[in-house]
Amino acid sequence: MKSRFLKAAFALVSACTLMACTPEKENNAAQDAAKTAAPATEAAQQTKDENMNKLTLTAEWDKVFPKSDKVEHSKVTFKNHFGIELAADMFVPKDTSLKVNGKFPAIAVSGPFGAVKEQSSGLYAQQMAERGFLTIAFDPSFTGESGGEPRYMNSPDINTEDFMASVDFLSTRDNVDPERIGIIGICGWGGMAINAAGIDTRVKATVASTMYDMSRVTANGYFDSANNADARNEARKALMAQRTKDFKNGTYDLAGGVVDPLPDDAPYFVKDYYAYYKTPRGYHKRSLNSNKGWAASAGTSLMNTKLLAYADEIRNPVLIIHGEKAHSRYFGEGAFEKMTGKKANVPAKLDATKNWSKTVGNKELLVIPGASHVDLYDNLEKIPFEKLNEFFKTNLK
């Protein structure tokens, strides 16, 4: 079971995550699995797509959720400080009740890790636009319709900058109040959002929903099972071997997306991922997790970069949302504890009739009874949009 669990994690997150939490024998098996999932010829196709140099934006509505008649939708682009052009969906509310002096409060959204804006982040953005906020959902650098070469890479620095670039874009729009801008990060982009909030004082309120701390899981393995120097050293060796191989071949092997076909005895969270990314519910042709995944050497720098290093210095409000049954909940609890210096102390069993929360100053941890990690991707009965609405209306005024 341990081997299957870790291999599933490998497919869903990245090669470096699995290598950080498995012994050498399982590392070799993981590398073999990656080679099988992404032969060099396929890797060449996957890492040299049309958005490397010039953005190609789809004109049709190709989201995995229905289009709302309460908002105006358009595509926009903007560059980050690394010169990478980002693509985003912008949702402008027809409801102008939150406008002050002709300007909207605004929210930038991204995630989950390995998803595209046509999936969960777009749903969040549209839902918040229905509530009166001008929103954008953007594809991070190297993914989706955004630029960046090579494809299917990630970086704690560049992806944090992506959030800050979204604030650049929003704060200079004529119809946005630059003093009322917030951000939402989903899954692995929850940690990126908190990191961005720790740097960018223009971000007045931050939500991390069903968050991962990608630096923690990459360096320590799942549930900190490989939190020791020897394990990290072995993981670094494997990553460097992958880099050498990629450079020699002139291509980038892919780690593999969600495991397919799905084993009957797969862990529940892998089944949840499959139910979202591999079925009509959430599948998208540009989504890494729906297809062949990240480059196998992606996220190398996450091994030595702690996203939450200065989270305790964030002065503006932060709301962390997790499901009671989410395998990832410990990331949110850890982030809350880092920011507040107080233990989360989530009860072992929650009252099924109401959400559980703990607030310290302007930082809040909210846990949804019965909800899993993936429930907070698209389950409108589980995602507490009215809580998000209240949070942003209170803090973006």
What is the predicted function of each stretch?
Residues 368-382:
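Catalytic histidine-centered segment of alpha/beta-hydrolase-like enzymes
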Residues 51-102, 377:
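N-terminal cap/lid segment of alpha/beta-hydrolase-fold proteins
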Residues 314, 320-322:
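Short beta-strand/loop motif that positions the catalytic acidic residue
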Residues 127-147:
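Conserved alpha/beta-hydrolase
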